[in-house]
Each structure stands twice: as C-alpha cells, then as structure tokens.
A protein has these predicted regions:
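N-terminal subdomain of nucleotide-sugar transferases
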Residues: 1-59, 220, 367-370
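Conserved donor-binding/catalytic core segment of Leloir-type glycosyltransferases
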Residues: 4, 192-210, 216-222, 228
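Carbohydrate-associated surface elements
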Residues: 164, 182
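Nucleotide-activated donor-binding/catalytic signature segment of Leloir-type glycosyltransferases, i.e.
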Residues: 238-258
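Aromatic "clamp/platform" in nucleotide-sugar-dependent glycosyltransferases that forms part
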Residues: 275
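Short hydrophobic beta-strand element within catalytic cores of glycosyltransferases
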Residues: 292-295
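Conserved acidic donor-binding segment of nucleotide-sugar-dependent glycosyltransferases
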Residues: 307, 311-318, 326-332
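A short, well-ordered alpha-helix in the C-terminal region of glycosyltransferases
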Residues: 333-348
C-alpha cells in the first residue's frame, strides 16, 4: 500500500522528539513492505532557524530509508483564518510534489487535527485517515475547534492514541478507533546495568503541567533515592535550585532516545508526575525497558499501568508520589514480564496490523467527490 504520512516535523539533533510519533509509524509501515513518503509541513515561526521552501530528503542516518518531502513555512502566531489558509496552501504543494514524483497514494495519513484539516481544505482526493495525539482537545482554542470540525467531517477514519482522547473526540461527535503509539521496543530492550544506590528516571518537558517539581519534592521525602531528570523547559531553574540542595536530584537536559534507553537500563523505576497525558509514550518506553512505572492519574498512562507493572497515584499530590515511590521501589518486579507485556502491546507489528485494518476500512468507505 502506498501511504503519504502528513506530519509536523521529523526528529533532529536540535529537536530529537519533534514528529517522533509520525516518524516511528512511517518507519514501521515501511518495514512491513508499505511504500511510505513522509510529507512534513513545518510551520513554526522563523525563530526556529531552518531552510525555507520545499526539499526532498532520504532519512538514512539509522538506515530507515524513509523518503521525506519537507516544506518549511515560517508562520508562527497568526489568526486562525490565516493559519488555515497557509496550511491548506502548503499541504496542497506537498501533495503535488508527492504525487508527481511517487504517484498517487492509496491513503493519506495525517497526524493531529491541524494537518488533517489542512488536507481537507487542500481538497486531497484520496482516502484520509486522521490520528489525534493532542492534549489540547480538553480545552481547544478557536483554531483547533475549527480544525476538529473540518477534519471530522471529511476523514474516512479517525484514530486516537488512548481511550481518554477517544472520549474527548466523541464529545465533538467524532467516532475513533484507539491505536497506541509505536515504541521502538528493540531500542529499549537492554540488559539492566548494575549501579550503586536506588535510581529513578523521569523524562518530560520541564513545565508546570509535567509535575517535575512535585516529583523532585517527593524524592526529597524518600532517603537514598536518586532522581535523574531528562528534559528541559521553563522550570529548569526551579529544579536547579532544588538540586543545589540535594545531590540526589540530577538534571541531564534534553537527550536522544539512545541515551534515554541507556538511562532506563540503569534505573530501578520510572516516574511520571504529569497533570495530563493523551498517551504517555515515555511510560511505554520505560515498560519496554522492563521498569515498573509510577504515574499519576493523568489520562493515557493509567490505561496501561496497573498492579502488574507499576502504580497510579493522584495528580499533584507530593505525599502520594513519595508513598508511591516507596511502594514501587520496595516491591520485587519481574522485569522480563513487564518488557514482554510492553512488546506485545506497543511493538511495531501489532500496531501496524491495526493501522492496516483502519486503512482498508478508510479505502472501502471513501467516496471520491468533485
């Protein structure tokens, strides 16, 4: 099957997690013998320096062999109307390049409402599948509300990455199939590294919604535990202040997934104190490493974290986080069983099987207009 994946970006050394969900799916589809072109529409403002215009790349740094067609347009903060028009124009230009160079896709797979709506406004004639990941659906602004409506009216199939997100889409009158994000389980399947003391790893953007300051305060209540934090963001200064008085709080900054996998292999547990998550891929990656996970009841993670692989505590409760850490760290875990469970749920094979079913349904139900 020939698939055009419409994405917001691709991972890079400067932004290793940008577009990572879309990229992982594209790689997995190609590995299952599908023809895949990743059409990237990067509409970030000009302060994110990059070459503007359309260009073709072949992603070979990991031998993935994915063809990437990029269109970089510095849009930034503009009115909803202008945003819609620019994205539709850019999507149309990407589509024209893809079809002229590689032929007509069997299906368009757009990630996020913004890009599914752009495909709709650009009047793509092919079947359209829309996957939603965005936590902002809980409180959408005007632009997102309009994009949801436009994409929902046009998409031949809609996918959500969690049941909670599916319920939010249902509130907009949109029915969706729940398919989780893909985890590179082979990358995270590493032998546990021996280390001194007790180590907990957490990975998140350092903003208030991720609860990292709360987690750091919780660790202060659990003697002998080192918290290794991967990520960066506006709360780094607050965390540096905490770390200055507690050598067991270690800030590692933003790291590529290979380094994250190394850190998880040397840990005893993973913790996420987020206030809201649509899926929580970092929790799934930790499970793939065989780690038990302590998470808050923030949405997506609580759909796959239970007594067999971790613990769920209330959001924003430092004492509950501290107690949860003590319980998770004080219990023996079968790391091999945790990793196997993650592989059976989040590995590329099972997820691609579900995507192929959705693609066939979209193609079958699609009615060409115009």
């Amino acid at each position: 099957m020939r698939v055009m994946v419409l994405s917001r970006g691709t991972p890079s050394p400067e932004a290793p997690l940008r577009g990572i969900f879309e990229y992982d799916q594209a790689v997995a589809l190609r590995q299952q013998a599908h023809e895949v072109v990743l059409a990237v529409l990067d509409a970030r403002s000009a302060r994110h320096w990059r070459k503007f215009g359309t260009r073709v790349e072949h992603a070979v740094e990991r031998d993935d062999g994915i063809t990437v067609v990029r269109l970089d347009v510095p849009v930034g903060a503009v009115s909803a109307r202008t945003d819609h028009r620019v994205h539709a124009w850019a999507a149309r230009r990407l589509h024209r390049t893809v079809t002229s160079e590689w032929g007509t896709p069997d299906v368009i797979h757009a990630h996020f409402a913004r890009f599914a709506a752009a495909a709709t406004r650009a009047e793509f004639p092919e079947p359209l599948v829309w996957t939603e990941h965005d936590s902002h659906l809980a409180n959408p602004d005007r632009r997102l509300t309009e994009d949801i409506s436009v994409a929902g009216d046009r998409a031949d199939a809609v996918v959500s990455v969690s049941q909670g997100l599916s319920s939010r889409l249902a509130g907009h009158g949109i029915t969706s199939t729940v398919i989780p994000n893909i985890v590179d389980v082979d990358l995270f399947d590493r032998p546990a590294r021996r280390h001194e003391g007790t180590v907990v790893v957490s990975v998140a953007t350092l903003n208030p919604g991720k609860g990292m300051v709360e987690l750091a305060h919780a660790v202060e209540q659990v003697p002998g535990v080192q918290l290794r934090i991967i990520g960066d963001g506006p709360q780094r200064g607050s965390l540096e202040t905490i770390a200055a008085n507690n050598p067991n709080i270690v800030l590692l900054g933003t790291q590529p997934r290979e380094r994250i996998a190394e850190e998880l292999a040397g840990a005893d547990a993973f913790a996420l104190a987020s206030h809201a998550e649509t899926f929580g891929v970092v929790c799934a990656e930790a499970l793939a490493s065989g780690l038990p996970v302590l998470t808050t009841a923030c949405g997506g993670p609580q759909e796959f974290i239970d007594d067999s692989n971790g613990m769920v505590v209330p959001v924003g409760d430092v004492d509950a986080l501290a107690d949860g850490l003590q319980q998770v760290l004080g219990r023996p875990w079968d790391r091999a069983a945790i990793a196997w469970q993650a592989r059976s749920r989040f590995a590329a094979g099972p997820v691609v099987d579900q995507l192929e079913t959705v693609y066939r349904q979209a193609i079958s139900s699609h009615v060409t207009t115009g």
